[in-house]
């Protein structure tokens, strides 16, 4: 049994490196897109769980110092 190897040939106009460049650009774009989505998801979680502790921390360090109940009450 003979094994054959098939290679794809770029039949488009222009230089062959142009096709490789566009695929590299697409893969770079995909990597940037994945990193952006990942970082935005992490930022959303940090904001979600960190907002209330941040408000309490800033409120406790303000002058005059309020009680914890006053910080947590909506009024």
From Swiss-Prot:
The modification N-acetylmethionine is found at residue 1. Pfam families: Tom7. Residues 65-75 are mitochondrial intermembrane. The chain crosses the membrane at residues 47-64. One of its GO terms (biological process) is protein import into mitochondrial matrix. Keywords: Acetylation, Membrane, Mitochondrion, Mitochondrion outer membrane, Protein transport, Transmembrane, Transmembrane helix, Transport. The keyword Membrane applies. Residues 1-28 are annotated as: Disordered. InterPro entries: Tom7 (IPR012621). Expressed in roots, flowers, young cotyledons and leaves. Residues 1-46 are cytoplasmic. It is a single-pass membrane protein. It is found in: Mitochondrion outer membrane. GO terms for cellular component: mitochondrial outer membrane translocase complex. Seems to act as a modulator of the dynamics of the mitochondrial protein transport machinery. Seems to promote the dissociation of subunits of the outer membrane translocase. Belongs to the Tom7 family. Forms part of the preprotein translocase complex of the outer mitochondrial membrane (TOM complex) which consists of at least 6 different proteins (TOM5, TOM6, TOM7, TOM20, TOM22/TOM9 and TOM40). PANTHER family: MITOCHONDRIAL IMPORT RECEPTOR SUBUNIT TOM7. This is Mitochondrial import receptor subunit TOM7-1. It comes from Arabidopsis thaliana (Mouse-ear cress). The gene is TOM7-1.
